[in-house]
Amino acid sequence: MDYEFLRDVTGGVKVRMSMGHEVVGHWFNEEVKDNLSLLDEVEQAARTVKGSERSWQRAGHEYTIWMDGEEVMIRANQLDFSGDEMEEGMSYYNEESLSLCGMEDFLRVVAAYREFVSKA
């Protein structure tokens, strides 16, 4: 899972992820932004579910993050729409609406994001 952190013209951090993990980048860009307390909550949840049968999820404005002891899933909330609710001819590109990754890989990205943000 490759990633890149960039700063836009306003100084905001943007995350770009490798193909198949784009949704992880969208989650950082849309849900986290400058809200590092959300990362605190996610890291605490990861410690809670790691090595257990439990799972945790948090629905945001655009994306929902779900994790169990081994993996993290981030999905666009729009995936809750049924096919009947979509306009004719419209469909969602699932690669950019759902992403799965290992817990350790995800936590490495979180740590790298924190480090990048702290280098303002």
Curated annotation (Swiss-Prot):
Domain of life of the organism encoding this protein: Bacteria
Family affiliation? Belongs to the UPF0231 family.
Q: Which NCBIfam families match?
A: PRK05248.1-1 (NF003574), PRK05248.1-3 (NF003576)
The name this protein carries in UniProt is UPF0231 protein YacL
| Record lineage | Bacteria, Pseudomonadati, Pseudomonadota, Gammaproteobacteria, Enterobacterales
Annotated gene? yacL
